[in-house]
Design a protein with these regions (language model features):
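Non-catalytic C-terminal accessory modules of carbohydrate-active enzymes
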Residues: 15-111
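Alpha-helical support elements that line or immediately flank enzyme active sites
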Residues: 1-14
Length: 111
């Protein structure tokens, strides 16, 4: 989700960038240790069609290490401080419609 946010920001779609970071989906959650909760349906199980997506009640976890908190920090830092070629717009990765107030201090632009 942070990769989608950074891509959307660079494409001049800051609302989509924020929406990607805040997307409510089971795989865009963070555990206390910073990992992303990669949950899957148990073998043979089906998602509850009434819910529209698998619920977090399923406990089958994928055995992988995904430190998503680092990606989240990189994405928000880039969205706030900018990147080479961003036109020197303040907080270019956030909508400039009054819905966000962004203050940045000491974070350099990404290439």
């Amino acid at each position: 989700f942070p990769s989608m946010a950074m891509t959307a920001a660079r494409l001049g779609r800051p609302k989509d960038a924020v929406d990607a970071l805040l997307m409510e989906t089971p795989k865009n959650t963070y555990l206390p240790n910073g990992h992303n909760a990669q949950l899957s349906l148990p073998s043979g199980a089906e998602a509850d069609s009434a819910a529209g997506s698998p619920s977090l009640i399923f406990t089958t976890r994928l055995p992988i290490y995904l430190p998503g908190n680092g990606a989240l920090l990189l994405a928000t830092g880039m969205m706030a401080s900018g990147w080479d070629g961003d036109g020197n717009v303040p907080a270019p990765g956030f909508p400039n419609d009054g819905s966000w107030t962004v203050a940045v201090e000491g974070i350099g632009k990404l290439p």
